[in-house]
Amino acid sequence: LFLVIATMMVPFEILMLPLYQEMMDLNLMNTTAGVILPGLCGASTIFFFRQYMIGLPKDLLDAGRIDGCTEYGICVKIILPITKPAFASMAILSTMGSWNNLLWPMMVYRDADKFTLPIGLNTLLTPYGNNYDVLIAGSMFGIIPILVVFLCFQRYFIDGMVTGAVKG
């Protein structure tokens, strides 16, 4: 647990070059998965899932064993349905982080047609003057997809955050 928390103190800029090499080895350069996967596998995600799993009642697992479920069956039929809020919360937070990131997508994406909105807004900045009306309108377009995803999964997100934060 200490090592997971300690890795949260390492700045992402230090991890970028090894992650870049890993994405090249996995042939994930210039793909959306190459942008999103590092956020899904971060230390904060692991720590959140650990805290969420500690709060699961052991009686449910024992009841599954008594009913004749294998360990795989317990995982699929009991644990996964209970952890939907945690998965939804982490998916929303990871997607928001990937969507709003500037430097990592600039490294992963090579084609201009795959650039994310922050990269596109960055290309509008010029040393000769900026059109702030266009930048602010573009920023609003950056908020809309995340807002729609949040509104669709709001119940799961709030359940996941509350359950993972409070042990009882």
Go through each PLM region and give its residues:
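A structural signal for multi-pass alpha-helical bundles of membrane permease subunits
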Residues: 1-168
